C-alpha cells in the first residue's frame, strides 16, 4: 500500500514468502524496538483504515509518517484529539438530565420520554462509545507485533493477490461509508444548533457561539468514526479468518486425492492440518481477546438506542417534516450498521467452524483404508478431538455465543421494548385526559 502523488491509495501485492523471509532476518531485539510494516499483510490490506486514522488524529503506529519529521506534531495531534473527545464525553454525560429552553413545548407533548432527554442520552452513548473505541484502537496499536504474527506469519501464508485486492477495495468502500455517516451526523447536529433543522435540541456543550457549535459537530464526527473503524477492523479480521478456514477445509478434503495414500503421506497431511488449525485458533483467540467485550457492549448499547430513536420517530412522525424524519433515519441506520458489522462476521465464523467439524469427520473416514497404520488413526483421532474441543465460535464478553439465534433474540428485544414504551405513552396520555375531565365542573340547570 502506497500513497501516490495524486493522494490516492494504490494496492501493491507482495508474496507472503518475501515478508516472512524479511522478518526472519531481524533479531529479537529489533522486534521489540520496531517492525517494518511496509510490505506486510497488515499494512497493505488494512492500509485505508490506517490512513483514515491518521487524518482523524488516531494515527496507527505502523504508519511510515511516524519515522519522519512529522512524528511529534502527529503525536500531539493524537493526544489532543483524545483529550477533546474525553472532555466532551464527560460534559455530555453530565447534561443528560438538563432541559433545553427551546424545547419546552415539544417535551410537554411526550408523556413518557421527552425528545431532549432521548437525544442527549443518544449523544452521550455515542460519545462514550467513540471514546472507548478510540482507546481500543490505541491498545491495538500497541499490540502491532501480535497482529503481525497472526496475519502475516499465520494466516498470511494462504493469501493470494485477488483475495488481498478484494479486501483492500472493500476497506476503501467501508471508509467512504464511515465518513459519509459521520459527516451526516455532524451536519445534523450543527444544523439543529443553528436552527436550520427543527429537531429537538440538546443542551449546549458550552454555548451557541459558532466555533463551539462546530467543535460539538467535530466531536460527534470523531466519535462516530472511531466506532466505525473498530467495527470495520473487526469485520475485516473475521473475513480474513473465514477465508483461512475455507482454505483449511480444502486442505483437509482436497478435490483430487489418492484413494489410499501411504502412511507417511497421511501423517504429513495431518501434521500440516494441525499446524494450520493452530494458527487459525490463535487468530480466533486474538480477535476474541480484543473484541469480545466490544461485542457485548455493542448489543447492550444498540438495543436501547434503537428503541429510544424508534419511539421518537413514532411519536414525532406525523408532525415532523422530511428533513427531521431523514435525520432520525440517519441515526437509526448508523446504529444498525454498526450492529451488523459486529454481528454478521461473528456468525460467519461460527458457520465456517461447523463446516470444519464436518470436514474433520470426512477426513477421518478417508483415512480408514485397508491395513491403515494405527499411528495415522491415533493422530487423526487427536486432530478430530482437538477441533471439537476448541470450536471456532466467538463469544460476547463470555456471556453468550455469537450465532444467528442471537440476532432473533436481538430483534425480539428491540420490538418488545419499543412496544412497552408505546404502551406506557398511551396509558399516560389516557390518564392525563381523565384528569382533565375530572377537573371540569358540571353545573346542572335548576329544576
UniProtKB/Swiss-Prot annotation:
Keywords: Membrane, Receptor, Transmembrane, Transmembrane helix. GO terms for molecular function: signaling receptor activity. Its main location: membrane. Residues 1-69, 138-171, 233-292, 350-405 are extracellular. Expressed in I2 pharyngeal neurons. Residues 91-116, 193-211, 314-328, 427-447 are cytoplasmic. Signal peptide: none annotated. It is found in: Membrane. Coiled coil: none annotated. One of its GO terms (biological process) is sensory perception of taste. The chain crosses the membrane at residues 70-90, 117-137, 172-192, 212-232, 293-313, 329-349, 406-426. It is a multi-pass membrane protein. The keyword Chloroplast does not apply. It comes from the Eukaryota. It holds the Pfam family 7tm_7. GO terms for cellular component: axon; dendrite; membrane; neuronal cell body; nucleus. Chemoreceptor involved in light-induced avoidance behavior. Probably acts as a molecular sensor in I2 pharyngeal neurons, required for the inhibition of feeding in response to light and hydrogen peroxide. Involved in circadian rhythms, probably by acting as a light sensor. In contrast to lite-1, does not act as a photoreceptor. Belongs to the insect chemoreceptor superfamily. Gustatory receptor (GR) family. This is Gustatory receptor family protein 3.
Amino acid at each position: 500500500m502506497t500513497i501516490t502523488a495524486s493522494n490516492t491509495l494504490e494496492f501493491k501485492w507482495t508474496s507472503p514468502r518475501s515478508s516472512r523471509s524479511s522478518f526472519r532476518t531481524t533479531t529479537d531485539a529489533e522486534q521489540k524496538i520496531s517492525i517494518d510494516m511496509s510490505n506486510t499483510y497488515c499494512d497493505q490490506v488494512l492500509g485505508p483504515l490506517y490512513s483514515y486514522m491518521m487524518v482523524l488524529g488516531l494515527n496507527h503506529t505502523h504508519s511510515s509518517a511516524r519515522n519522519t519529521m512529522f512524528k511529534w506534531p502527529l503525536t500531539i495531534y493524537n493526544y489532543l484529539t483524545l483529550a477533546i473527545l474525553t472532555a466532551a464525553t464527560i460534559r455530555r454525560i453530565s447534561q443528560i438530565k438538563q432541559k433545553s429552553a427551546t424545547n419546552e413545548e415539544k417535551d410537554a407533548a411526550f408523556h413518557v420520554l421527552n425528545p431532549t432527554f432521548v437525544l442527549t442520552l443518544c449523544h452521550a452513548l455515542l460519545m462514550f462509545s467513540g471514546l472507548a473505541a478510540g482507546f481500543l484502537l490505541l491498545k491495538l496499536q500497541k499490540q502491532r507485533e501480535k497482529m503481525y504474527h497472526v496475519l502475516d506469519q499465520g494466516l498470511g501464508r494462504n493469501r493470494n493477490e485477488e483475495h488481498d485486492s478484494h479486501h483492500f477495495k472493500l476497506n476503501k468502500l467501508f471508509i467512504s461509508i464511515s465518513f459519509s455517516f459521520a459527516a451526516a451526523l455532524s451536519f445534523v447536529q450543527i444544523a439543529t444548533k443553528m436552527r436550520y433543522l427543527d429537531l429537538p435540541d440538546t443542551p449546549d456543550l458550552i454555548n451557541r457561539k459558532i466555533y463551539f457549535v462546530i467543535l460539538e459537530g467535530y466531536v460527534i464526527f470523531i466519535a462516530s468514526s472511531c466506532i466505525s473503524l473498530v467495527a470495520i477492523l473487526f469485520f475485516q479480521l473475521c473475513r480474513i479468518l473465514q477465508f483461512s478456514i475455507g482454505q483449511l477445509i480444502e486442505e483437509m478434503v482436497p478435490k483430487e486425492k489418492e484413494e489410499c495414500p501411504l502412511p507417511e503421506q497421511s501423517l504429513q497431511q495431518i501434521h500440516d492440518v494441525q499446524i494450520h488449525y493452530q494458527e487459525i485458533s490463535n487468530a480466533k483467540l486474538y480477535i476474541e481477546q480484543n473484541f469480545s467485550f466490544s461485542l457485548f457492549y455493542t448489543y447492550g448499547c444498540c438495543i436501547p438506542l434503537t428503541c429510544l430513536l424508534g419511539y421518537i420517530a413514532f411519536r414525532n412522525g406525523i408532525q415532523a417534516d422530511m428533513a427531521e424524519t431523514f435525520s432520525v433515519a440517519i441515526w437509526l441506520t448508523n446504529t444498525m450498521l454498526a450492529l451488523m458489522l459486529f454481528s454478521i462476521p461473528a456468525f460467519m465464523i461460527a458457520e465456517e467452524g461447523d463446516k470444519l467439524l464436518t470436514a474433520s469427520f470426512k477426513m477421518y473416514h478417508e483415512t480408514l483404508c485397508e491395513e491403515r497404520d494405527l499411528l495415522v488413526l491415533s493422530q487423526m483421532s487427536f486432530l478430530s478431538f482437538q477441533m471439537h474441543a476448541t470450536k471456532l465460535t466467538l463469544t460476547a464478553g463470555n456471556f453468550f455465543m455469537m450465532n444467528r439465534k442471537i440476532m432473533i433474540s436481538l430483534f425480539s428485544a428491540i420490538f418488545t421494548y419499543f412496544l412497552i414504551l408505546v404502551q406506557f405513552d398511551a396509558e399516560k396520555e389516557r390518564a392525563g385526559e381523565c384528569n382533565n375531565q375530572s377537573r371540569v365542573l358540571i353545573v346542572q340547570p335548576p329544576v
